[in-house]
Design a protein with these regions (language model features):
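Structural motif
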Residues: 18, 40-41, 63-66, 86, ...
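Short, hinge-like loop/turn segments at secondary-structure boundaries
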Residues: 15-20, 29, 37, 82-86, ...
């Protein structure tokens, strides 16, 4: 799910079986139709409350939603949408870096995790450009390089 077609195209190229436009009014219904009743897992990196709610609503019973991006302040979730489901906040992948980082490097070496296609490097002096590119959808994950 994304708002930018080039990101959806990249997802298909990297192995996604379905892509959906995040602006669709019936987004949750589309996920339920594709998955036969809701996803087992959903994952939100935006921290946008409406998107976070959709990520939870897209789950089937016993589904798990992982939230990476969050905003400061309170978040309202429909209590009924949470019944029978799990919502977890994720920090640094909720993994042991001593194990996880070497594993990700191995995946990259095997061609299974092409993170180099998901990032764009910016010198620290271009921090504003990096943020703008991220917000406009031009860059999936900007990486700032210290001078």
């Amino acid at each position: 799910v994304d708002l930018h077609q080039h990101r959806l195209d990249l997802a298909l190229e990297l192995g996604a079986t379905h892509v959906l436009d995040g602006r669709a009014a019936d987004l949750v219904a589309q996920v339920h139709a594709i998955t036969g009743g809701g996803a087992n897992y959903s994952f939100d990196t935006t921290g946008v409350p409406a998107v976070m709610q959709n990520a939870l609503a897209a789950l089937r019973m016993t589904g798990v939603c992982g939230y990476v991006g969050v905003q400061v302040g309170n978040l309202e979730l429909d209590g009924l949408a949470l019944v029978g489901k799990t919502a977890i906040g994720i920090l640094e992948g909720s993994a042991d870096p001593q194990t996880f980082i070497p594993e990700m490097i191995r995946w990259w070496q095997e061609g299974r995790f092409p993170f180099d296609r998901l990032i764009e490097r910016y010198p620290m002096s271009q921090i504003n450009e990096a943020e703008q590119s991220s917000l406009s959808g031009g860059t999936i994950k900007p990486v700032l390089i210290p001078s």
